[in-house]
Amino acid sequence: MPTIQQLVRKGRHDKSTKVATAALKGSPQRRGVCTRVYTTTPKKPNSALRKVARVRLTSGIEVSAYIPGEGHNLQEHSMVLVRGGRVRDLPGVRYKIVRGSLDTQGVKDRKQARSRYGAKKEK
């Protein structure tokens, strides 16, 4: 324990908390360019081919972002909007691509939870 004199000289410091979405630099979303679009396998006990893109953000940081929904039209040099939100079974993937904005199309024939996947209301 510090003495009162040490506290007068130095004071106490607050512990700094780590931000989960540091690459967004405090923004809710950030624009970026796809540098690589690929599939990867999840950790045990799951099995699939998850669609992931490597994105260079306007903040200058390159991150891995998950492409949600069935089917996508992304390729290298596509402009995407990236939001926070990790994918639990993909280590190192802490961002998601927003469907239906910029070059990313919405999910076709989506009936429920449409706003999350950028799908328009069917007439």
Curated annotation (Swiss-Prot):
Residues 1-26, 103-123 are annotated as: Disordered. GO terms for cellular component: small ribosomal subunit. Keywords: Methylation, Ribonucleoprotein, Ribosomal protein, RNA-binding, rRNA-binding, tRNA-binding. The keyword Glycosyltransferase does not apply. It comes from Corynebacterium jeikeium (strain K411). Residues 113-123 have a biased composition (Basic residues). The modification 3-methylthioaspartic acid is found at D89. Belongs to the universal ribosomal protein uS12 family. CDD domains: Ribosomal_S12 (cd03368). This is Small ribosomal subunit protein uS12. With S4 and S5 plays an important role in translational accuracy. GO terms for molecular function: rRNA binding; structural constituent of ribosome; tRNA binding. Pfam families: Ribosom_S12_S23.
